[in-house]
Structure formats: structure tokens, C-alpha cells
Amino acid sequence: MNAELYITKASLQISKGEIDKAVDSMMKAIEIGNDMISATKAHCFLGEYYFVNQDYASSKEHLEWIAQRQEELEAECDDLLNDEIDKANLLLDMMETFSLIE
């Protein structure tokens, strides 16, 4: 399976409430690494998931992956990933503002 299919699979798992399985699918999408768009979506999902579950170190790792590539993503993908980029920046700002991360 390619990364895009793992993202689709994760979306279906989320709709069924199978969040742990969705996390596994998103991790597989990242491991495959053949699609920047799918990897960005997976990192965003995982960053948000870990943030909600108060695992701020893991959240930061995934969200910083997006933030570090923001210019490249904006140049290559136009506005396709704006939501993911905005969410990553917002959550990183929140973690910094409330001293949730070092």
C-alpha cells in the first residue's frame, strides 16, 4: 500500500472510532515516505493526537516536521496543506505559550 492509501484507511478508522488503529496507519504512511502531502497530513494528525493526549514531546516532534518544511510545502503544494500548516503552527505556539515544551 502507498502512503495515500494509509491516510484513507486512517480516515475510515477514525470514522469508526478506531483511533489507535488510525495512529498505526498514520505512522505507516510516514514510514513509507513516498508522498510529501500524505506525510504532512499524517504528521499533522499525529501532532494533534499527541497534543490532545498531553504527550507534548511527541506532538512537538510531528508538528515541527511540518513547521520546518513550511516554505517548501507552500511552494510545492500551493494552498493544499494550509490547514495542516496553520494547525501545526497554532499548536506549537500554544505549547510554547503555556510552557508545555522546552
State where each predicted segment sits.
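Alpha-helical segment of the N-proximal tetratricopeptide repeat
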Residues: 2-24
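TPR/TPR-like (Sel1-like) alpha-helical repeat modules
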Residues: 51-75, 90-93
